[in-house]
Amino acid sequence: MKILVINGPNINFLGIREKAIYGKEDYPYLLSLLEGKAKKEGIEIVTFQSNGEGEIIDRIQEAYSDQTDAIIINPGAYTHYSYAIRDALASIEIPKIEVHISNVHKREEFRHVSVTAPVCTGQIVGLGLQGYLLAIDAIISMNIG
């Protein structure tokens, strides 16, 4: 099984930006969590991070032809307004889970709406970095790979 984990804008700044919201652990720590989970479960996890909308869309489209079985995506702020990322996700007929480290529903009003979630299989919010691991567990339980 191959899972693509896409992280959008500013996720590379984990541990630097707004620690009270996103925690003190940094992006390399998140990558190590994902790597450990992949080894434990005997699956392949491919990670991708970009601050650019077009690069994220390109990577989603690449998943169509590179044997990706599922996508976990944290679109960052693009969650709330990127219909282009939404359309790219909708075009790939594999499980997709949207993850947010913070509980976006307890934050500013503009964060309460996700334009990308309706084209995803599910959404996990507010559980910190653990949300990524829960998304992996959910995908594994779907028996797709």
UniProtKB/Swiss-Prot annotation:
GO terms for molecular function: 3-dehydroquinate dehydratase activity. The keyword RNA-binding does not apply. It is an enzyme of class 4 (lyase). This is 3-dehydroquinate dehydratase. The lineage of its organism: Bacteria, Bacillati, Bacillota, Clostridia, Lachnospirales. CDD domains: DHQase_II. Homododecamer. NCBIfam families: aroQ, PRK05395.1-2, PRK05395.1-3, PRK05395.1-4. It holds the Pfam family DHquinase_II. Substrate binds at residues 74, 80, 87, 101-102, 111. The record marks 17 as: Transition state stabilizer. Pathway: Metabolic intermediate biosynthesis; chorismate biosynthesis; chorismate from D-erythrose 4-phosphate and phosphoenolpyruvate: step 3/7. InterPro entries: DHquinase_II, DHquinase_II_CS, DHquinase_II_sf. It catalyses: 3-dehydroquinate = 3-dehydroshikimate + H2O. Signal peptide: none annotated. Catalyzes a trans-dehydration via an enolate intermediate. Keywords: Amino-acid biosynthesis, Aromatic amino acid biosynthesis, Lyase. GO terms for biological process: amino acid biosynthetic process; aromatic amino acid family biosynthetic process; chorismate biosynthetic process; quinate catabolic process. The active site is at residues 22, 100. It comes from the Bacteria. Its EC number is 4.2.1.10. Belongs to the type-II 3-dehydroquinase family.
